[in-house]
Each structure stands twice: as C-alpha cells, then as structure tokens.
C-alpha cells in the first residue's frame, strides 16, 4: 500500500505565506494606529467644544436670540471658530443665529472664490464686504513699514458698520489663549501696562459687543483641528506687509515655555482671572492713600515679611462658576 502523500511547502509558497503574514500584521498595526488617531482626534474635538462652551458660559457671550457675526478671514482660527459654533448651536439649549462675514480688502492675489464656495457648501449664511483698504494703506504707509496698525483700524471700523447693517448683536473674533498671553506680554514688555485681550468687551464706538469664544483654546490644538478638518486656508501674507516682529517674538517665547516648562503659560493665562488689586500698585484700582490699620484680621492682608506661597497653580478662568451652553455626554 502506498504511503499517504504529504504536500511539501516549496520556497515560493513559504515566501508567499511570510508576505501574507507580514501584511496581516501590518494591517492590524495600521488599524491600531488608525484607532489611536481617531481616539485622539475625538479627544481634540471634545476638548475644543468644551473649552468654547465654557468660555461662552463663563462670560455670557451668547444669549437667546442673538445674531452672531463670525468674522472669517480664511485663517485656521476663524474657520475653527465658525465650525465649533455651528456644532455647539446644534446642542445648545438656546436659539441663536450665525452669519459669516469676510472683508475682501483687495490684496493682489487674494483668492476671492474660496470663502464663498466653502460657506455655500456648508450652508452658512454669509456676507462678503468688498472694500479696497489695501490701496489706502499702501498709499499712506511708507514702503518697508508694517501696515498692520492702520489696516486693523480700517478693518475694525468697516466690520462694526457691517454688523449694524446685518443686525448682528455680537461680533465673534477668532483670538485664542496664545493671542491673549502674547498681548499681555507685549503690553508688559513694550507698553508698561498690565493689559491683556478680554474675552468680551464693548467696542470703542459703544455700539457693539465683541466676543472671543476661542479664549480658552490653545493654538496648537487649533492647528491640529484645522488640519483634521481640511479647511481651505488662505495665506495671511498676501498684503506683503512686514511681519509684526514683536508679536512673533512673544509667540516663539510662549512656544518655548510650553515645551520646556509645562504649565507655565497656563498659569500665566489663569492669572488674568485671579487678580489681587491690593497687591499691585495701581491707585485707581485700590485706595492705597486712604488705607488705615483697622485692628481686625484681613484674609487678604499682606503677610509683609514672608514670601508669598506659590507653585500651587492658579484656578482657571471662571472657576466653579462656569456654565456651559451644551451638554457633552452625547458628543
């Protein structure tokens, strides 16, 4: 009787098996990597939505019946602002409207089709304001000098006017945590002021309320979010203006601190909401001249000879008082 035939695995079959096994391992690794990326992306989205919702609640930025004019420049921050406000509106317990506004300043090479196409695609009402401020700035500012200051003033006046024409009750800007800290440092280093960039303010013409819903968001998170959402970014160097070197210096400083000293920038930001006027030097904020010993203990009194305890970390803006306009359990 013949012995049963045992098939032999030749070299080609063995190589194919190895390749198949390697491909399967690679597929599983890719799946795990994709799962991790999806998890991190979801965390990023939830974090940004939570931060924007908290900022809105802490400062009562948006109220029932508001019409919010979102200033859209084509940069990552304003795109993210509009995108997150749209998502928040779906879950908010109040009703409010959004309208996107872009000021086309007629810089050479500005891709004027990008924003209308994007906003039409996502179904957001919008208004494009065409004003040739570029020519005005170029005519008035000497060659080689930065045009940012004059350009900003012209842009601000136009946007305030447009807000009135559209019936907007709030004007939303895309400034974030890093912008606020940069402004604080710029005013300290170059202006001799303790002055930041408030999350909510009355405009200088007294007719508008300006809000910054991204106040609690980090720029690095917004960069990742813009990449994830694939926003059609319009470059910000079209005007050919000299860069704001002082602000760029502050930005680099903050990025460096974030890497080398985790938590430092967060504490600086939190300090803006934990001010002790009696321990500063502004006589307009605290009546130093009339200060007298009362004979009663004061919990806010100065220890005088002891070092003030530090390193415990400041509580975040809003603290326990924060009220969110959205529930996050279903995100």
Curated annotation (Swiss-Prot):
Associated pathway: tRNA modification
Domain of life where this protein originates: Bacteria
Gene: ttcA
Name of this chain's protein: tRNA-cytidine(32) 2-sulfurtransferase
Location of the motif PP-loop motif: 73-78
Note on cofactor: Binds 1 [4Fe-4S] cluster per subunit. The cluster is chelated by three Cys residues, the fourth Fe has a free coordination site that may bind a sulfur atom transferred from the persulfide of IscS.
Main location: cytoplasm
Purpose of the protein: Catalyzes the ATP-dependent 2-thiolation of cytidine in position 32 of tRNA, to form 2-thiocytidine (s(2)C32). The sulfur atoms are provided by the cysteine/cysteine desulfurase (IscS) system.
Cofactor: Mg(2+); [4Fe-4S] cluster
Gene3D superfamilies for this protein: HUPs
UniProt keyword rRNA processing present: no
């Amino acid at each position: 009787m013949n012995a049963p035939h045992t098939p032999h695995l030749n070299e080609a079959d063995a190589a194919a098996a190895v390749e198949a096994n390697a491909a399967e391992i690679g597929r599983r690794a890719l799946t795990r990597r994709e799962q991790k990326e999806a998890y991190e992306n979801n965390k990023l989205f939830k974090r940004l939505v939570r931060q924007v919702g908290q900022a809105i609640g802490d400062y009562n930025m948006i109220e029932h019946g508001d019409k919010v004019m979102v200033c859209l420049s084509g940069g990552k921050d304003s795109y993210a602002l509009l995108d997150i406000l749209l998502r928040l509106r779906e879950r908010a317990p109040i009703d409010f409207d959004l309208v996107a506004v872009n000021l086309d300043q007629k810089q050479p090479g500005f891709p004027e089709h990008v924003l209308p196409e994007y906003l039409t695609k996502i179904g957001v009402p919008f208004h494009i304001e065409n004003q040739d401020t570029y020519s005005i700035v170029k005519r008035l500012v000497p060659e080689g000098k930065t045009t940012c200051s004059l350009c900003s003033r012209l842009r601000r006046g136009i946007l305030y006017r447009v807000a009135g024409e559209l019936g907007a009750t709030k004007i939303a800007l895309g400034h974030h945590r890093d912008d606020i800290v940069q402004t604080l440092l710029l005013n300290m280093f170059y202006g001799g002021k303790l002055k930041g960039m408030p999350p909510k303010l009355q405009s200088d013409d007294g007719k508008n309320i300006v809000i910054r819903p991204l106040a609690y968001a980090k720029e690095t998170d917004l960069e990742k979010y813009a990449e994830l959402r694939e926003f059609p970014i319009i470059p910000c160097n079209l005007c050919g203006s000299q860069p704001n070197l002082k602000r760029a210096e502050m930005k680099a400083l903050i990025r460096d601190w974030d890497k080398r000293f985790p938590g430092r920038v967060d504490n600086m930001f939190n300090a803006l909401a934990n001010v002790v006027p009696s321990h500063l030097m502004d006589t307009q904020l605290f009546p130093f001249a009339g200060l007298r010993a009362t004979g009663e203990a004061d919990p806010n009194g100065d220890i005088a000879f002891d070092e003030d305890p530090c390193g415990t970390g400041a509580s975040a803006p809003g603290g326990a008082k924060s009220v969110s306009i959205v529930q996050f359990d279903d995100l």
